[in-house]
Structure formats: C-alpha cells, structure tokens
Amino acid sequence: MRKLKMMLCVMMLPLVVVGCTSKQSVSQCVKPPRPPAWIMQPPPDWQTPLNGIISPSERG
C-alpha cells in the first residue's frame, strides 16, 4: 500500500509543478460597440393616439 501511495505521489508531482509554473494567456478586453442612436431616444408616446381611437363607452 505504501508503494502505491508513493507511485501516485511521483506521478502527480510533475502535473502539479507544471500547472503551477505555466502562465495562462489573458486575452485583451474588447470594448462593446456603442448603442445605436434610436436606443438613446425617449420612447414614443402611444397613449395619446390610442386615447383618440379607444374611448370608454358612454353611459346612457
């Protein structure tokens, strides 16, 4: 059993050493594109035209 543990330790040690010493490449941050101009405008007023079309029924 002791020999098995030693064998596992010897096999895992190079992986640990390589994992700790290798440097990961970091990609540059890409700026997102600016939003289109129509997104920055205020929303259209749909309430006023709809009030002229849809009105509550008259009480009679």
Curated annotation (Swiss-Prot):
Lipidated positions (N-palmitoyl cysteine) are: C20
Q: Which residues form the signal peptide?
A: 1-19
Cellular component GO terms, alphabetical: cell outer membrane
Topology class, membrane: Lipid-anchor
The keyword Membrane is assigned to this record? yes
User: Where in the cell?
Assistant: Cell outer membrane
Q: Which GO terms describe its biological process?
A: viral release from host cell by cytolysis
Q: Where is the lipid attached (S-diacylglycerol cysteine)?
A: C20
Residues annotated as transmembrane? none
- The organism's place on the tree of life at top rank: Bacteria
Q: Which residues form a coiled coil?
A: none
- PROSITE patterns documented for this protein: PROKAR_LIPOPROTEIN
Q: InterPro entries per the record?
A: O-spanin
Cite the entry's keywords alphabetically: Cell outer membrane, Cytolysis, Disulfide bond, Host cell lysis by virus, Lipoprotein, Membrane, Palmitate, Signal, Viral release from host cell
Report the family membership: Belongs to the lambdalikevirus o-spanin family.
Entry function: Component of the spanin complex that disrupts the outer membrane and causes cell lysis during virus exit. The spanin complex conducts the final step in cell lysis by disrupting the outer membrane after holin and endolysin action have permeabilized the inner membrane and degraded the host peptidoglycans.
Subunit structure and binding partners: Homodimer; disulfide-linked. Interacts (via C-terminus) with RZ (via C-terminus). Part of the spanin complex which spans the entire periplasmic space. The spanin complex is composed of spanin, inner membrane subunit and spanin, outer membrane subunit.
User: What is the official name of this protein in its record?
Assistant: Prophage outer membrane lipoprotein RzoD
